[in-house]
């Protein structure tokens, strides 16, 4: 907008602002409109002005233009002094008729393109900005109504200019909207393409997952097939090794006058089937410690172990410990009958938490005690003891429970055993390779994996009265057996099928009709046990079952201890009478909690009188598991809770201190503590030790004691490394198996003994005595 004002002296308009406005038509025609002050002329001046111009140029311009003009403002040059003075003298007489118009005129303007401004400048000469005096005089003749028209025109033009500006802005917005819409369409197309690609990728992933699952199933199927394919080779290899061992032992016959004391050890846990268990016959010892065998009444019992020699003052050693030629001839008939039953089983009837779990029933005067872990005394001062556990252990009795299946968990007891076996064999294989090896062994037909020990599939576990020489004779007789012997059915009386206190599991009884042994099929008839069949019909007036499902609390306890569920362990333990109950492999909840590293569960079980010396089928105690994991806190709690530091496993006869893993973390601390506990047993605390289990003396030089009794070690390893001379509080002395002794008493016996805790001196020397 341009603001113009008119003013000056008397009778002379002073053009200090815009004096001319050029109107540009759409046809580029230019008209000039004067904006000088309008004075009312006199009659003489009006005639003069009418002579020069008949009409006003502004009115003629409006009549000729059919479209709104475009306004261009031209600035006048500064006025000349002479012209101003002359004009002042000419118009001075007119002052009485006109007055200066000092009202400002507001003229709207707009921008003009440079090309059009240049064209306007070319069309107008340089001096076109100055009107002739005649034209100026003509402007003075405009009527007053024309001023209102000019103002209206200007208002309309301003409105048109505003609308044109708004129109241009709307067109720009429309253009931008079109561009954004096109861009949005492009993005939508791209999104659709990406969505289709995502669906294809999801479909491929789903197909790959299904393929992986099918491959896993196929791999498992291949593993199962390989298991059955490789079973025969492993069985033959084991039989050859056992045959060589039997031949070597038969060659080194021991004099019958010498008595061998078996190595003391807590026997492995075995399943006790109370329904099929029958009492074992007992033989009373005479004053000369001689026993007689009654083949007619008790065929296959433990009475057959001793010879009938009445002339001997000292009984012959157990037949499975030291073979002799006399026993071979004497028991050849019995061995043939016993060898035909490869499926009879031995179970441990002792399930008390205070008694050591054993394979044979203990009765004070019976001969089974001599087999377990006792010493024999004789008149001669010399007593020979075996140097290895294999010389005094009937290995056929160790495999009578259910199978010890291979587990792939890394925190279970079986995984701990795998690592221990790998370390004992000195192999450089990783744990994954060891697992593959164990799986291969299982596919060959083995039900468990224990190095250098036969399995239940390789030899019958019911041969309890055979000597090693008799086993050699049996193996030779099987090889030369004729085909006619294999076709004959061996019918045995029912009383001959039950050997002593041996039991047969349901799985063995169901599969003992026909069995392949060394390529020959042996058939026998087994008396079917009569059982009461429970009907499925509901009795009258009997409460209906609401259909609630209750899980076995023992299974829940074992799984919860392995998974670390303390609440479930507590609820399951409240439903059991003894938290030390084990499964068919001898594994307790304490074993699982230690192998999984759940310290709170271990403490809870120990505080609830869990047996800290419970052994599984391989003789592993919870202390062996903790030592194999190098877990010093758990080792310390088990030792202070009454754990036997001198307990040995059955597979490799290693104590807990020998189970520490050298390549794992925490080896130094665990080894240092266990070495101190091992060496301090019987030395520290004035030589006091505590019985973990009760023991009945089988010979005169042995000492009987109960679980929890306090004993004082007088002398170590004088007669045998595994037998110590101890004294009770009442003054009785005798030989005690050291594997029954603990450095600390169990929690349930501490109040009775008034026990005071003490700390172990941690020695720098880790050598175990």
From Swiss-Prot:
Keyword terms, alphabetized: ANK repeat, Apoptosis, Nucleus, Proto-oncogene, Repeat, SH3 domain
Family recorded in the similarity comment: Belongs to the iASPP family.
Recorded phenotype for the gene knockout or disruption: RNAi-mediated knockdown results in an increase in number of apoptotic germ cells. Double RNAi-mediated knockdown together with cep-1 abrogates this increased number of apoptotic germ cells.
Residue stretches of biased makeup (Polar residues): 354-378, 453-467, 474-491
Function description: Negetively regulates apoptosis via its interaction with cep-1.
Keyword Repeat annotated: yes
Subunit relationships: Interacts with cep-1/p53; the interaction inhibits pro-apoptotic activity of cep-1.
Biased composition (Low complexity): 275-284, 339-353
Residues in ANK repeats: 585-617, 618-652
Claim: Membrane is one of the keywords in the record: no
GO cellular component: cytoplasm; nucleus
Disordered as annotated region, ranges: 69-88, 265-396, 451-518
UniProt GO molecular function: p53 binding
Compartments it resides in: Nucleus
Name listed for the protein in its UniProt record: Apoptotic enhancer 1 protein
Bias-annotated ranges (Basic and acidic residues): 285-295
Boundaries of every SH3 domain copy: 684-746
């Amino acid at each position: 907008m341009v603001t113009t004002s008119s003013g000056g002296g008397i009778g002379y308009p002073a053009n200090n602002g815009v004096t001319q406005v050029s109107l540009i038509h759409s046809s580029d025609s230019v008209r000039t409109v004067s904006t000088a002050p309008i004075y009312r002329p006199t009659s003489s001046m009006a005639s003069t002005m009418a002579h020069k111009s008949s009409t006003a140029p502004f009115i003629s311009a409006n009549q000729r233009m059919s479209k709104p003009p475009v306004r261009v403002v031209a600035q006048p040059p500064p006025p000349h002094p002479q012209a101003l003075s002359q004009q002042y003298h000419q118009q001075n007489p007119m002052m009485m008729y006109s007055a200066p118009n000092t009202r400002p005129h507001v003229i709207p303007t707009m921008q003009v393109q440079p090309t059009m401004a240049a064209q306007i400048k070319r069309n107008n000469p340089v001096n076109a900005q100055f009107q002739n005096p005649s034209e100026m005089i003509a402007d003075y003749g405009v009527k007053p109504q024309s001023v209102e028209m000019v103002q209206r025109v200007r208002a309309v033009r301003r409105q048109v200019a505003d609308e044109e500006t708004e129109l241009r802005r709307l067109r720009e917005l429309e253009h931008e909207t079109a561009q954004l819409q096109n861009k949005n369409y492009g993005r939508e197309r791209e999104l659709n393409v990406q969505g289709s690609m995502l669906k294809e990728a999801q479909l491929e992933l789903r197909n790959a997952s299904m393929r992986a699952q099918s491959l896993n199933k196929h791999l498992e199927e291949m593993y199962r097939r390989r298991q059955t394919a490789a079973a025969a080779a492993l069985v033959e290899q084991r039989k050859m090794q056992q045959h060589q061992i039997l031949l070597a032992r038969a060659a080194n016959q021991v004099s019958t006058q010498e008595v061998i004391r078996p190595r003391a050890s807590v026997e492995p846990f075995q399943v006790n089937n109370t329904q099929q268990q029958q009492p074992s016959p007992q033989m009373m010892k005479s004053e000369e410690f001689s026993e007689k065998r009654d083949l007619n009444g008790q065929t296959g019992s433990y009475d057959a172990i001793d010879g009938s020699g009445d002339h001997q003052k000292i009984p012959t050693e157990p037949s499975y410990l030291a073979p002799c030629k006399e026993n071979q001839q004497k028991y050849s008939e019995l061995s043939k009958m016993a060898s035909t039953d490869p499926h009879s089983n031995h179970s441990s009837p002792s399930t008390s938490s205070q008694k050591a779990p054993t394979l044979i029933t203990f009765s004070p005067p019976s001969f089974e005690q001599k087999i377990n872990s006792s010493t024999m005394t004789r008149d001669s001062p010399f007593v020979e003891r075996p140097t290895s556990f294999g010389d005094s252990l009937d290995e056929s009795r160790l495999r009578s429970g259910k199978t010890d299946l291979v587990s792939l968990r890394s925190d279970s007891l079986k995984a701990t055993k795998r690592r221990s076996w790998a370390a004992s064999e000195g192999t450089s294989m990783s744990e994954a390779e060891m697992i593959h090896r164990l799986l291969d062994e299982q596919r060959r037909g083995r039900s468990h994996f224990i190095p250098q020990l036969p399995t239940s599939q390789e030899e019958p576990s019911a041969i309890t009265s055979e000597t090693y020489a008799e086993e050699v004779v049996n193996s030779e007789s099987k090889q030369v057996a004729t085909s006619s012997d294999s076709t004959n059915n061996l019918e045995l009386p029912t009383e001959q099928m039950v050997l002593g206190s041996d039991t047969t599991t349901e799985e063995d009884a169901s599969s003992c009709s026909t069995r392949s042994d060394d390529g020959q099929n042996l058939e026998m008839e087994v008396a079917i046990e009569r059982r009461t069949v429970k009907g499925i019909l509901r009795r009258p007036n009997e409460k209906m079952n609401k259909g609630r499902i209750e899980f076995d609390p023992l299974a829940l306890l074992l799984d919860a201890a392995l998974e670390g569920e303390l609440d479930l362990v507590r609820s399951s333990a409240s439903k059991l009478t003894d938290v030390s109950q084990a499964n068919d492999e001898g594994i307790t909840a304490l074993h699982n909690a230690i192998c999984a590293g759940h310290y709170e569960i271990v403490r809870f079980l120990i505080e609830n009188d869990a047996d800290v010396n419970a052994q599984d089928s391989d003789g592993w105690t919870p202390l062996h598991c903790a030592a194999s994991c190098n877990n010093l806190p758990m080792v310390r709690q088990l030792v202070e809770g009454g754990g036997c530091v001198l307990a040995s496993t059955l597979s490799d006869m290693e104590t807990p201190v020998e189970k520490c893993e050298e390549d794992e973390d925490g080896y130094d601390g665990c080894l240092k503590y266990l070495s101190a506990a091992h060496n301090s047993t019987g030395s520290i605390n004035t030589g006091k030790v505590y019985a973990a289990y009760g023991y009945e003396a089988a010979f005169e030089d042995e000492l009987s004691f109960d679980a929890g009794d306090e004993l004082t070690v007088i002398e170590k390893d004088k007669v045998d490394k595994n037998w110590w001379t101890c004294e009770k509080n009442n003054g009785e002395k005798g030989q005690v198996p050291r594997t029954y002794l603990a450095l600390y008493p169990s929690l349930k016996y501490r109040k009775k003994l008034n026990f005071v805790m003490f700390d172990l001196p941690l020695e720098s020397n880790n050598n175990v005595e």
